[in-house]
Amino acid sequence: MIRPGAIGDLILSLPALESLQTGYFEVWVASRNASLVRFANRVRSIASTGLDLLGITDPPPSLIDSLSSFDSIISWYGANRPEFRELVGSLNLQFHFFPALPPETGTMHATDFYLDQVRDLCASTSDPIPRIPCDVPRENFAVIHPFSGSARKNWPLDKFRHLARGLQRAMPVRWCAGPDDPPLDGAVRIDDLYELARWLAGARLYVGNDSGITHLAAAVGTPVLALFGPTEPGVWAPRGPNVRVARWNR
């Protein structure tokens, strides 16, 4: 399984990845996401394999040997690159390509989109809710993460601060910044995503934008309020029994 993409993209596709487990099972992902894949026999970063060099320069023999050793390769990597698909075909590598993102005009939730892609290849049925196991006791604090991968998806910071003042009457509030987020005074910043997941799993409440960290909080079972602006929650909202979504506009 080769799954590029940001934090949220990986998390939304976890049910599809897990449904394909059979025999020996490797998952190749973006380096930062590797610690979030807990179910594979082996997890590798795409960069460490040399796959990103395939089609650009002569690939290392170890990469071709590794790819040739698999009976099947399910890839969201290179799906929109005809030259990459042609190259792996010429090498007789057993690739099955799938689009990495749902269509822009689509209405199907992203997790269902990924599950639907692999349905004919599934070794088992899968829970359509992304889950990352974290055995962490719940504590009495709220987390606010005011960032995302795009400024247009961010609820204004002053409104988050106003919300925090209200929440502080009920419980302590801790601010959170992800590994790629800008500086924020007093924010907890944990670079390892699984360790960040464990910290989020201890929160009584999480509030954030349409972001990978919001998907991470939902996947560990923390009660989540996800604030959506221009993106479509019907496609991109986090899933889980403890997730609530609110829409905002400026």
Please state what every model-predicted region is.
Residues 1-250:
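Catalytic machinery of carbohydrate-active enzymes
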